[in-house]
Amino acid sequence: MIKIQGFGFPFTVEHSSCSTMSPKYFNWSKEQQDIQIYIDGSIFSGLNTERHENKYAWICESRFMSPKRVRETLLRDKEQILSKYKYLFTCDKELCALDSRIKWCYSGSNLPWSFARNEAKLTDKTKLVSMICSPKDFSEGHRYRLNMANQLKDKLDLYGGAHGSIRPGEGTGAHRDKAEAIDPYMFSVVFENDSYRGYFTEKLTDCFAKGVIPIYYGDPDISEHFNMDGIILYTDGCLGSLTKELYDSKKDAILDNMERVKNMPIAEDYFYEKFIR
């Protein structure tokens, strides 16, 4: 299998941006390879080497997690970066509109973490609504989710460690099993780390993989990827309308979104198949 040299990995080189899954078309490597991809903060270190036809950049993380300098430079003086790469991959549609050399791809961690353990399936639904929220508070998006979890904690089953809630899954690893917090539920409140066009993560697709309807705050363009009859956009007071009857009325959309997730590639396979191979 082909190998691609990566720089600045925000994930383990043995796997991919999607938990412990691996790309279908190539393996990542830290050793010298013909194809090179500079990721997130390393995009600037790539400016010190000459452009070639197999040299790419990838903004893998969200706007907050990836260095702001990369995005700010693209908005102010895009040639400073683009002149050194064949293409730059990102989920940020605002950046994609700047230049044809900036190619949209899924964000890192776009597929369900559960895919590393088992396939998508419609699980038995015995509970109404959950929410997963970690105690992380180092970004505006984290703090917004924490605040909303505090407001909603008496109206749903809260998991993730925030506000004294249970952390689902075994151990202390980065990719804990969320089954306890997702599988038995009809609905789950999902707040992404940020809200901008093109950005969604496993927080959303974890729900679709187990037949859960997300109560969603995140990508304004999410209808371009999923059936909106199987998504409820978060609004104040929306939890009061959640019932088993409502869930059952959306079964077709639930199954449709599950199939869409089953057929969705990880970010790496998407940009490799469309722009590199």
Language model features with spans:
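Pol beta-like nucleotidyltransferase catalytic core
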Residues: 1-59, 63-158, 162-277
